[in-house]
């Protein structure tokens, strides 16, 4: 057995909720530069973007984007929006991942044998619910990642200033900008990510190919990351473009997608695919492995506290 041993008592809903948020924050800390590179690549080619310095930069590939940002804006630019990103994960991942098992059991009426339909429904539900809770943090994160530090093109001085400025200039609706594509994206992402992880892990365990420990969690998470990136990239690009757009640039998420298709062609929907996969693949591995271990560690700590002397 590699890592913490599974406890006899299954993790509580609270343990899953806190464990998911904490694991997601750890994963974000490690993979955030890849996410920032993905955002810069996704908005590239958007000629009328609000941050011209960022939008007009010529980024080529993951490494090229990271090197260009470090050269022009300094290493700290790779972590633009990190505070909002961590705020997002604590509210977002806690709901979409931490509540997944509980919602799945609700749809299966407590049965241990969950079908693909119940898993998909649970993933869609928690993914959409998480967006409703965490959308403002996602908007601020994307705005920070998109803005360039060089050339005086910064839109916001701090995370708090970003929330205040968006609310003042665009109204409260501005903080929930892009909710529709984000709900669609996260329903898709959650289904692809959690359901694929669930299915791969169950298959490996039932076929006795692996035991329920770190190698199994690593393999399941990596496979889930690839499947999720392929499925979710188009709606992810639209979400990023729309949330970063100036007021009036696009009338809706659908208009944003149509404009991309007309001006840049179908390939635009897979801009930033490589950093998306590198980020999501590595993020999934770190998050799921950490999450599984945190659940076991927290339950072991709880058991030791409750054990009689």
UniProtKB/Swiss-Prot annotation:
Residues 16-63, 278-285 are annotated as: Important for interaction with long-chain fatty acids. SUPFAM superfamilies: Mitochondrial carrier (SSF103506). Residues 41-77, 146-173, 243-268 are mitochondrial matrix. GO terms for molecular function: antiporter activity; L-aspartate transmembrane transporter activity; malate transmembrane transporter activity; oxaloacetate transmembrane transporter activity; oxidative phosphorylation uncoupler activity; phosphate ion uniporter activity; protein homodimerization activity; proton transmembrane transporter activity. It is a multi-pass membrane protein. Pfam families: Mito_carr (PF00153). Signal peptide: none annotated. GO terms for cellular component: mitochondrial inner membrane. It is found in: Mitochondrion inner membrane. One of its GO terms (biological process) is cellular response to glucose stimulus. It comes from the Eukaryota. The chain crosses the membrane at residues 17-40, 78-103, 120-145, 174-199, 218-242, 269-294. The record marks 141, 185 as: Important for inhibition by GDP. InterPro entries: Mit_carrier, Mito_Metabolite_Transporter, Mitochondrial_sb/sol_carrier, Mt_carrier_dom_sf. Residues 1-16, 104-119, 200-217, 295-309 are mitochondrial intermembrane. Keywords: Membrane, Mitochondrion, Mitochondrion inner membrane, Repeat, Transmembrane, Transmembrane helix, Transport. Solcar repeats lie at residues 11-106, 114-203, 212-297. The GDP-binding domain is located within the hydrophilic cavity, with GDP phosphates likely forming salt bridges with the charged residues, Lys-141 and Arg-185. Antiporter that exports dicarboxylate intermediates of the Krebs cycle in exchange for phosphate plus a proton across the inner membrane of mitochondria, a process driven by mitochondrial motive force with an overall impact on glycolysis, glutaminolysis and glutathione-dependent redox balance. Continuous export of oxaloacetate and related four-carbon dicarboxylates from mitochondrial matrix into the cytosol negatively regulates the oxidation of acetyl-CoA substrates via the Krebs cycle lowering the ATP/ADP ratio and reactive oxygen species (ROS) production. Belongs to the mitochondrial carrier (TC 2.A.29) family. Homotetramer. Adopts an asymmetrical dimer of dimers functional form. Interacts with MICU1 (when methylated); leading to decrease the calcium sensitivity of MICU1. PANTHER family: MITOCHONDRIAL DICARBOXYLATE CARRIER-RELATED (PTHR45618). This is Dicarboxylate carrier UCP2. The gene is UCP2.
């Amino acid at each position: 057995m590699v890592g913490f041993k599974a406890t006899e008592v299954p993790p509580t809903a609270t343990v899953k909720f806190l464990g998911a948020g904490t694991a997601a924050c750890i994963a974000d800390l490690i993979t955030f530069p890849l996410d920032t590179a993905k955002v810069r690549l996704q908005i590239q080619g958007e000629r009328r973007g609000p941050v011209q310095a960022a939008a007009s930069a010529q980024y080529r590939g993951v490494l090229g984007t990271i090197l260009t940002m470090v050269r022009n804006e300094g290493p700290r630019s790779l972590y633009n929006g990190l505070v909002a990103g961590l705020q997002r994960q604590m509210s977002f991942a806690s709901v979409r991942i931490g509540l997944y098992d509980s919602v799945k059991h609700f749809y299966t009426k407590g049965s241990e044998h969950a079908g693909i339909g119940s898993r998909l429904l649970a993933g869609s539900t928690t993914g959409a619910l998480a967006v409703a809770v965490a959308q403002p943090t996602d908007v601020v994160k994307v705005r920070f990642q998109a803005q360039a530090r060089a050339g005086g093109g910064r839109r916001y001085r701090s995370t708090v200033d970003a929330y205040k400025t968006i609310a003042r200039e665009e109204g409260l609706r501005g903080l929930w900008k892009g909710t529709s594509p984000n709900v669609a994206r996260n329903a898709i992402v959650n289904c692809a990510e959690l359901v694929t992880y669930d299915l791969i892990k169950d298959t490996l365990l039932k076929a006795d190919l692996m035991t329920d420990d770190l190698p199994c969690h690593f393999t399941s998470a990596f496979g889930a990351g690839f499947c999720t990136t392929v499925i979710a990239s188009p709606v992810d690009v639209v979400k990023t473009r729309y949330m970063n757009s100036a007021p009036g640039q696009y009338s809706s998420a659908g208009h944003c997608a149509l404009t991309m298709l007309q001006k840049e062609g179908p390939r635009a929907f897979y801009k930033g695919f490589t950093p998306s996969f590198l980020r999501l693949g590595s993020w999934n591995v770190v998050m799921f492995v950490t999450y599984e271990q945190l659940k076991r560690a927290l339950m072991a700590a709880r058991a030791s506290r409750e054990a009689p002397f």
